[in-house]
């Protein structure tokens, strides 16, 4: 439909170990290793935006990394995941815990700024 943006996302499960992160399609691990979910946003843009000739246009947008459930992880685990997010291209990395309400206000503030918006 012309002039309408459609937004969607999908969660991609992965297992983290000392060797890295492995993607696990359609299954979860129960061996005690840390589970990661990388959420991937998909956007169908206006026809005019799709006609832009810049290669890999969508890949040039800023990325925000968010570490969730920080109350369940050690500082070492949080530090490791933060470094992975930075290596993956996240310009801003936030640590949040909904249980303790840590980092949630900062996340919403960042999402409502021009520079933090993806």
UniProtKB/Swiss-Prot annotation:
Entry-linked InterPro entries: EutP_PduV (IPR012381), P-loop_NTPase (IPR027417)
GO biological process: biogenic amine metabolic process
Classification via SUPFAM superfamilies: P-loop containing nucleoside triphosphate hydrolases (SSF52540)
Top-level taxon in the UniProt lineage: Bacteria
Molecular function in Gene Ontology: ATP binding
PANTHER family: PROTEIN YOEF (PTHR40453:SF1)
Name of the protein in its database record: Uncharacterized protein YoeF
